[in-house]
Amino acid sequence: MNNETIAKAKRNMNKSIEVYQSNLATVRAGVANASLLDRVMVEYYGVPTPLVQMAGITIPEPRVLMITPYDKTSLNDIEHAILASDLGLTPANDGNVIRLIIPQLTGERRQEIAKEVGKLAEEAKIAVRNVRQEAMKALKKQEKDGEITEDEERRLEKEVQKVTDESTKKIDQMADNKRKEIIQG
């Protein structure tokens, strides 16, 4: 029973890290990256549809994303969805494809994006701490219900803390790497 609590905590902390990793992938670092468009939803025949399911996305140049819709009639819908997103990019629609030119980042904008990375990291660490808190409560309940001894509870709490520290360290490392990528451009 007690190992289930630890295993569940590890799984949930890893999920928090995965969510953070996917959020980091959508942060613009001044270079074209197809994952920038992962969260863009297009209103397609009245149904919100992920852009990546509606179009091929290629990178013909280091700072250009080219979006080729599978259905040419959705070109304007895709353009509107990109404009409505929080990407801060202006699409160029030539009637067949949409080009997104990723502008060079100014020093000020780099700092803003680095702060955003920090904010995302803090949200991920809060999620990890919430998982830790749930695991600790579960261990206390197990001890109270007589499922585990007090010594076992302390040992397992230390293990939960160790997993929490490892997860937090991993998040910090990912944030530092992304900040370096952004600052160096």
Swiss-Prot record:
Q: Sorted alphabetically, which InterPro entries does this protein's record hold? A: Ribosome_recyc_fac, Ribosome_recyc_fac_dom, RRF_sf
| A Pfam match | RRF
Molecular function as annotated in GO: ribosomal large subunit binding
What subcellular compartments does it reside in? Cytoplasm
Q: What top-level branch of life does the organism fall under?
A: Bacteria
> Which Gene Ontology CC terms are recorded?
cytoplasm
Keywords of the record, alphabetical order, are: Cytoplasm, Protein biosynthesis
A single Gene Ontology biological process assigned to it is: translational termination
Q: Has keyword Oxidoreductase?
A: no
Disordered: annotated span: 138-185
**Protein's job:** Responsible for the release of ribosomes from messenger RNA at the termination of protein biosynthesis. May increase the efficiency of translation by recycling ribosomes from one round of translation to another.
Q: Which family does it belong to?
A: Belongs to the RRF family.
NCBIfam families attached to this UniProt entry: frr (TIGR00496)
Name of the protein in its database record = Ribosome-recycling factor
Question: By which gene is this protein encoded?
Answer: frr
